[in-house]
C-alpha cells in the first residue's frame, strides 16, 4: 500500500523511496536532495497545502543529517485529511537543502531552528540565521558529534 502522493510520483517516474508507514498509517518517503525542490512544488500543487511541521535530526555520529517535512492536504468539505511525511537526507560535510519557505511560509522559523541546532543550510531562505543560540556560538548543539564548550558563564545571583 502506498500513499496517493507516492502513487503519483511512481506514475510520473519521480524517484523516491518509501520508508514505511507510522502507527497512524502515514507514509514516510525519502526524497533525494537534488529532487527536493521539484517534489516540494509538486506536493503543493498536488494539494499538500499545509506544512504541519518541519524538523531535523542527526541520524548517527559521522553519518547523515535528516530534514523532515510533515505535509497535510486540507480540502473544504473533506473530514479526513491526507498526510505524508517526506525526509531529505544530507551529508554533514555539506548539509545544504533548498528552502521551502517560498512554498509554505510556516517553514520560516522551523528551518531556522534546524539550521541553528544542526547546521543544515536551507538555500534561498530569506532570514537564515541563528534563532535560539547567540550568533557568536560555535558549532551545532544537536549533532551527535558536538563537543560541549569547556566554559560556563557564572552569573551574580544577587
Curated annotation (Swiss-Prot):
Subcellular location: Plastid, Chloroplast thylakoid membrane
Family classification: Belongs to the complex I 30 kDa subunit family.
GO cellular component, one term: chloroplast thylakoid membrane
Bilayer disposition of the protein: Peripheral membrane protein
Underlying gene: ndhJ
Gene Ontology process terms (BP): photosynthesis, light reaction
Alphabetized PANTHER family for the sequence: NADH DEHYDROGENASE [UBIQUINONE] IRON-SULFUR PROTEIN 3, MITOCHONDRIAL, NADH DEHYDROGENASE UBIQUINONE IRON-SULFUR PROTEIN 3
Source organism superkingdom: Eukaryota
Main location: plastid
Subunit structure: NDH is composed of at least 16 different subunits, 5 of which are encoded in the nucleus.
Keywords: Chloroplast, Membrane, NAD, NADP, Plastid, Plastoquinone, Quinone, Thylakoid, Translocase, Transport
Functional description taken from the UniProt entry: NDH shuttles electrons from NAD(P)H:plastoquinone, via FMN and iron-sulfur (Fe-S) centers, to quinones in the photosynthetic chain and possibly in a chloroplast respiratory chain. The immediate electron acceptor for the enzyme in this species is believed to be plastoquinone. Couples the redox reaction to proton translocation, and thus conserves the redox energy in a proton gradient.
Protein name in the entry: NAD(P)H-quinone oxidoreductase subunit J, chloroplastic
EC number annotated for this UniProt entry: 7.1.1.-
Enzyme class: translocase
One Pfam entry name: Complex1_30kDa
Molecular functions per Gene Ontology: NADH dehydrogenase (ubiquinone) activity; quinone binding
Catalytic activity field: a plastoquinone + NADH + (n+1) H(+)(in) = a plastoquinol + NAD(+) + n H(+)(out); a plastoquinone + NADPH + (n+1) H(+)(in) = a plastoquinol + NADP(+) + n H(+)(out)
Source organism of the structure: Dioscorea elephantipes (Elephant's foot yam)
